[in-house]
Structures are given as C-alpha cells and as structure tokens.
C-alpha cells in the first residue's frame, strides 16, 4: 500500500541512500533530493523502480533559499501527496573557534538548519489537516557529547535540535516532528580504515551503527502515529564517551 511520498534530502548516497531504500520497502514513494550527486540519485531511482517502488529525483542547492522554496511544490506537483520529510542532507566541514569564518558559519546554518525549517514550513502550509505528516531530522550524538572541532557543524545541529522540540509543540496535530541522532556511522574523508574501525570498536557496544540501523529508526518514527518531539540515539553508546577532540582525530594516533 502506498503511504504517500517522503522527501529524503541528500537521499542518494551513504545514510540517505539507506533511508530511501528502507522507506521504499515500507511502501512510501521516495523523492530523492540531490545537489551534485545526480548520477547516484538517478541510479537509485532505477533501483527502487526495479524493485517495484516509486521514486524520482529532484535537484536543489540547500544553501540557496530560493531553490529550497521550490522543492516541496515541485515534488507535490510531480508525485502527489507528501506525507513526510527526512532532513538528512548535511554539510560537515572542519572549523573551530580560531578558524571559523562567515562563509563556513552561514553555509552550515543554511544547509543544516535553515533549509529544514523552510521545508517543514512548506509541508505544513501544504498539509490540509486530513492526513498527518511526519518529519524526521537527522542530528548527531554531538548534541549531548560536544567537542571543540567542527564548530559550525555542531552549532547547526544544536539549532536543529531546538527546532525539533519547538516545532513538535507548535505544529501538532498536522505534523509530527522527531529526530535520529547517529553516532560515527561512515568513515570521514580524513579518516583511515583502521581509524574508523577503532572508533566503532571503542563504543560501549563494541561496534558502530550502520546506515541500515539509522534507516530502521527513521522508518519507525515516520510511521509511529503517537510519537512526536522525540530523539532516538543510534550511536552504540558513543555519546557516553568523553572526547577532547572529534573522533576522527582521536582515533588516528
């Protein structure tokens, strides 16, 4: 049974791809957002369609508010009723207190926090109140276990955390707003394979989360009709580890 269309931002690769595939298997039509990953996006569209699902791909630069504002109307006109959004797309570039710049701060905030606000607003305005819609924001375990590295990124995730609670209160009953906070799931560009393995093995559970683990939690929240304003940590307990620096740097020594 088709459960309506879900927009997955950054839905073509990595964790976003796992989320898109899982929600498709749940019966949702998938609107795969991409910016520069057009090849990956349309390949995933074909994979979903070959498995009997419904999918299409939509381009937008989430650092550009004008492009963001066109995304929900375009998906609605192409794919019909939108029953949810997964705000998965995220910029993760290094800065700290000494290296932070206006460009870094603004780009992180635009992509990681402002674009989710605009998409949620457009979904709320589109929703006629007859069918409750669901939003899942992808956060980070850093929201309870911060360190000085990736300062703009971390601040943007704290902003999205606050929005999750605020909007869950104010947009009910038309929209449910929840979040998933992953741990270190995929190796960073600066990280070696051995460093990534070390970072996952050092968690309290002795292994790290997989993209599919994240997708399973998103799937639950997308369909849990009585749940709003909640955060699920999918981090193998990483948030209990106190680190002076980001895990990428601590596991490379």
Spans of model-derived segments:
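Conserved glycine-rich cofactor-binding loop
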Residues: 12-14
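Conserved Rossmann-fold SDR core element
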Residues: 23, 161, 171-185, 227-234
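Conserved glycine-rich Rossmann-like NAD(P)H-binding loop of the short-chain dehydrogenase/reductase
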Residues: 28-43
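Conserved NAD(P)H cofactor-binding loop of Rossmann-fold oxidoreductase domains
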Residues: 88-93, 237
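Substrate-binding pocket helix/loop in short-chain dehydrogenase/reductase
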Residues: 96-97, 101-106, 199
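Catalytic loop of short-chain dehydrogenase/reductase
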Residues: 132-159, 164-172, 184-185
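C-terminal substrate-recognition "lid" of short-chain dehydrogenase/reductases
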Residues: 211-234, 239-240
């Amino acid at each position: 049974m088709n459960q309506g269309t879900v927009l997955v931002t950054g839905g073509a690769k990595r964790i976003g791809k796992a989320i898109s595939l899982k929600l498709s298997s749940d019966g949702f039509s998938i609107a795969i957002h991409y910016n520069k990953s057009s090849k990956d996006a349309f390949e995933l569209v074909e994979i979903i369609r070959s498995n009997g699902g419904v999918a299409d791909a939509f381009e937008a630069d989430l650092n550009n508010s004008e492009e963001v504002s066109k995304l929900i109307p375009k998906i609605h006109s192409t794919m019909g009723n939108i029953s949810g959004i997964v705000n998965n797309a995220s910029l993760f570039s290094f800065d700290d207190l000494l290296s932070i710049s206006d460009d870094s701060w603004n780009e992180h905030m635009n992509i990681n926090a402002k674009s989710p606000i605009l998409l949620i607003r457009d979904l709320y305005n589109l929703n006629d109140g007859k069918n409750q819609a669901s939003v899942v924001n992808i956060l980070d375990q850093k929201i309870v276990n911060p360190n000085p590295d990736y300062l703009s990124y971390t601040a943007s995730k704290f902003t999205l955390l606050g929005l999750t609670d605020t909007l869950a209160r104010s947009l009910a009953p038309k929209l449910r707003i929840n979040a998933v906070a992953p741990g270190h799931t995929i190796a960073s560009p600066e990280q070696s394979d051995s460093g990534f393995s070390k970072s996952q093995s050092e968690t309290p559970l002795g292994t790290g989360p997989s993209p599919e683990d994240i997708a399973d939690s998103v799937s639950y929240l997308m369909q849990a009709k009585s749940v709003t304003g909640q955060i699920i940590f999918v981090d193998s307990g990483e948030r209990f580890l106190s680190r002076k620096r980001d895990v990428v740097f601590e596991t490379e020594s």
